Amino acid sequence: MSVDQTLYSRTPAAMADPTCAGPAAFTAAGAFSQPDLMAFSLREEEPIWGFDTIAPSMASWQGKMEQQTFCNPNMERGLKNTHVRNGQPTPPPFDDKKLQTPMGEMYPVAQYAFNSSPPEYAPPKHRSSLSEQSQTDGYGVSTRRRKASAIDQCEQQQEREKREKFLERNRLAASKCRQKKKEHTKLLETRFREVSNKKGELESEIEHLRSEVLNLKNEMLRHAQCGDEAIKIHLAQMVRLITSKDTPNRDLVSPMRSPEQMAASTPHGLSFGFDGPMQLPSEMGSPLDQRRDSEQSIMTESSYTFSTDDSFEELINV
């Protein structure tokens, strides 16, 4: 075994610093004594038991560490494991798994050669960045969701307000329609009452006029005994009209007939538009006979008929 392969030849496998030298850094000449070790100042957070792997016989620590600063660990590994076969150096099989640092193994003192303080390890930026990115993405997604939900709520609120306005307009239109219908119904009822009252008034007026006509006819019948020719002719026409209505097939009454003859020929069941049949007195025949027999009456039958028609028209015009 060479000097390079000492007790501390496995330390390069535990070293993770690429600037650190290989097994050549820990030689027998580079061992330091106990007083040199005590010269280093230790921080309170550094474990003291990490220095137990270093032998007290190592010396010239600082000089050897200055030489190993620019050493390449790959070159040291190649020189260490190289064998000469057939005049040519042939490297033996090398397992890279040996270079991996065990989980429970501590770093040696060689790592702290250039600095008295322990190395400060950077936090895992990749993991933190992934976590921060995931948090940022989650925050962005949640923000977008909140915005989308807020927009949906605003749209729903707007739709609700539009529907409420539409329903309010419908209610107002329905109330106006009902109010107009009530007013129209009241107007029709008022008009019906007015027309009904007017109809009643007209009917009462008709009855009043009928009663007046009957009173006038009765008054005329009272004056039938006065001997006035106009009244007699008017009564004769009334009797003729009533007879024609009651008996249309009977011949018309001659106007030359006397009232006594008309009364005798008229049946008692005929109605003259009064409450009862007209009763003519029997005393009317004597004055008429006396007048006809008088010397002053020289009118013939035809002239009497003509004169009576003219006098009746004059009475109507009056």
Swiss-Prot record:
It comes from the Eukaryota. Residues 160-223 form the bZIP domain. Transcription factor that acts as a key player in the regulatory circuit that integrates secondary metabolism and cellular response to oxidative stress. Regulates the genes involved in development and stress response through direct binding to their promoters. Belongs to the bZIP family. ATF subfamily. One of its GO terms (molecular function) is DNA-binding transcription factor activity. The gene is atfB. This is Basic leucine zipper (bZIP) transcription factor atfB. The lineage of its organism: Eukaryota, Fungi, Dikarya, Ascomycota, Pezizomycotina. Keywords: DNA-binding, Nucleus, Stress response, Transcription, Transcription regulation. It comes from Aspergillus flavus (strain ATCC 200026 / FGSC A1120 / IAM 13836 / NRRL 3357 / JCM 12722 / SRRC 167). GO terms for cellular component: nucleus. Induction: Expression is positively regulated by the developmental and secondary metabolism regulator veA. Expression is highly increased following piperine exposure. PANTHER family: CYCLIC-AMP RESPONSE ELEMENT BINDING PROTEIN. Residues 202-216 are annotated as: Leucine-zipper. Pfam families: bZIP_1. It is found in: Nucleus. InterPro entries: bZIP, bZIP_sf, bZIP_transcription_factors. Residues 160-199 are annotated as: Basic motif. The keyword Transcription applies. Residues 114-157, 275-301 are annotated as: Disordered.
